[in-house]
């Protein structure tokens, strides 16, 4: 649990997807996943959900964001999805206005006990209380439905009030720092 094996597996999956669709069009990885859905109605529904988010974020500023694991290491496995939902992935929490903690094997309830001592007051996300805990099973995008749900979660976290899919409290929570 919580080891680098999961990160390597996700990075391998992304490498395979990037190889198939090319580096120039990041959104193609979502399209590739959605195109693999056999049920035409479900495929259309998933595409509509993605299109809704994409349309809204066209008119919004990008949000500097970082995803950390339980050792405060940067997790880059979801960077492509972060970019597609209007995030600007960062490598250092000092540059991120939004901080998300997520790691496979660590549900939100467990993260609640681990995160407080890891936070640094000088981080902008901590200063502005933009810290989120993401359930371990939700921060995955290996299948189309998971990817779209993860995209909706990220949209809610990055743009509170602009996107409301009803996932707060179920798949992620806002962790108040002030």
Predicted regions and their residues:
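N-terminal ligand-binding lobe of clamshell/alpha-beta domains
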Residues: 1-178
